[in-house]
């Protein structure tokens, strides 16, 4: 089913005549570019893109099947949308109420000649098109190569910021537009911080270092986490204080991946990982969800959480990222992006998940 066909089915289900899209993430599949500017209006009969002169030429080359409108001082959002409303005799117009300010919503309510209804079309992004899957697969490939590069690069005596800068630079060389979010590098005791962004801390031999990072490629994100052991004289994985914790996290992650298949509820996948960690005695040290959907945004719905009852379907892409965090000692997290297939699940990363030492060829 095409993007417009899916959206029109959604309009019927929501009992709406049309929808006005204003958020970057919901406009991007229509515009072909990522921008906070411009609007998309989709009715049951027509499709419209409204952009100003900065984006008109670029969007014009991509906007097949859409009527393209130039926004300027005369042709405003209100003018153009009201003309569409009049031409098609629209009665109800959905808008992204969760994405716009109260002031904007109030102004639209008074200026647009249709009944405005807050509606959220985010659900339409849960199942990716084959083209979207391919872009995310390529974004994951960049992250995968980045993980192996940074594993060899890291040495004791480097700062976390130096490591993050090298990783982000390498991913850009591989084709990434930029990092898909602020890179996390958390070594030693900072590994107990689930979102420990890279700091000036110096990594030391024998420490675990958790790297959580991703690449943005053609508007789509990857998200990957590996916990590595910083190499040095006498360093041994098996003798590390958190070696057993690492094995528990890995078992939890593999259990969750094994649970992924069409028809399974998201909460069941979360339970598969959480049960392993809880039975090992670390349930109180795993405080976040097991994973989340990924696409145009790093964090999308549905979530692998205890409360999410969404049923998995082929074409969904989600992360699986359990972790254990021990204050004062450190932590371990392992994360993959997983594609739900008709048969089960496909992990989009190739890097091994055993304890790997840094610096080794």
Curated annotation (Swiss-Prot):
One of its GO terms (molecular function) is metalloaminopeptidase activity. This is Aminopeptidase YpdF. GO terms for biological process: proteolysis. InterPro entries: Creatin/AminoP/Spt16_N (IPR029149), Creatinase/aminopeptidase-like (IPR036005), Creatinase_N (IPR000587), Pept_M24 (IPR000994), Pept_M24_MAP (IPR001714), Peptidase_M24B (IPR050659). It comes from Escherichia coli (strain K12). Its EC number is 3.4.11.-. It comes from the Bacteria. Co(2+), Mn(2+) or Ni(2+). NCBIfam families: PRK09795.1 (NF007310). SUPFAM superfamilies: Creatinase/aminopeptidase (SSF55920), Creatinase/prolidase N-terminal domain (SSF53092). The keyword Protease applies. The keyword Protease applies. Hydrolyzes the N-terminal methionine when the next amino acid is alanine, proline or serine. The substrate preference for methionyl aminopeptidase activity is Pro > Ala > Ser. Also able to hydrolyze the Xaa-Pro peptide bond when the first amino acid is alanine, asparagine or methionine. Gene3D superfamilies: Creatinase/methionine aminopeptidase superfamily, Creatinase/prolidase N-terminal domain. Its cofactor is Co(2+); Mn(2+); Ni(2+). Belongs to the peptidase M24 family. The lineage of its organism: Bacteria, Pseudomonadati, Pseudomonadota, Gammaproteobacteria, Enterobacterales. It is an enzyme of class 3 (hydrolase). Signal peptide: none annotated. Keywords: Aminopeptidase, Hydrolase, Protease. It holds the Pfam family Creatinase_N.
